[in-house]
Amino acid sequence: TLEGFEEVVCIERKKSVEEIANNVGKEKKRFDAEMERINEYTFKYIICEFSMDDIINYPRCIFSENMWHTKPEFCEREIAKRKITGKYILRALMEYQTWYGIHILFCDNAKNAKKVTESIFKRLNTMFHEQT
């Protein structure tokens, strides 16, 4: 969080597409309540440590190319267990973005997500200190 501005800034980090699939799937009611709570903040972000490609290709993306090559039957069985599709995840995220004004940023990995988060904090810190 940004010291002194915890009341106006909220950054929610998501480590994997599986995490967000769980949030908008099995835990949707809880996650919707969390989005309602986040809506009270002036500046709100969901920082994703994965790509838009991961969302679009979910659930196929959860297995590496090597895994698909060496154990295709296993991959297919595991994917068949999933009830959530990438299309559904994308729809849910775009609804949160549209309805609650939450900025959703796809950063590809944890390192990039950290850099993006730091950059957001720097911009907000500059803005807040110019206003005081």
Where in this protein do the model-derived segments appear?
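Conserved catalytic cores of phosphodiester-cleaving nucleases, focusing on short active-site segments
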Residues: 9-15
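Non-catalytic C-terminal interaction segments of nucleic acid-processing enzymes
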Residues: 1-7, 19-132
